[in-house]
A protein has these predicted regions:
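Short S/T/G/P-rich N-terminal loop/turn motif that feeds into the first structured element of a domain
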Residues: 1-53, 60-70, 93-104
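C-terminal structural segments of small proteins and small subunits
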Residues: 75-90
């Protein structure tokens, strides 16, 4: 079953650091089979905390998603942004429901 990294950014103090992080880790994430599904964009918050940026990556399996996040190369990339960026980040195993019949 596929898995997803869901990152909800609560604070971005330095856009350049975040850009460097993204440029560094994108090829690393892709090496583990990651595909970007959502990267920022216009949003409206109706309930709860506002997150100025949301990023969702899809992985071929939960194991690959965890392996990527725990890899030394990914951790080194995250070091580029973590001092000026706060986020909620989860790895979720599941599937995207793409039709009404699949949601029943």
């Amino acid at each position: 079953m596929k898995a997803y990294w869901v990152s909800l950014y609560t604070k971005i103090e330095n856009q350049e650091n975040l850009k460097n992080y993204a440029q560094t880790v994108t090829p690393i994430i892709k090496k583990y089979g990651g595909i970007a599904l959502v990267r920022g964009g216009k949003h409206i918050t109706y309930e709860g905390e506002d997150f100025p940026r949301t990023v969702i990556w899809e992985f071929p399996s939960y194991e690959k998603a965890v392996e990527c996040h725990e890899s030394e190369e990914y951790k080194a990339g995250w070091n580029l942004a973590k001092k000026t960026t706060n986020r909620h980040m989860q790895i979720i195993e599941g599937q995207i429901m793409i039709s009404k019949s699949s949601m029943q």
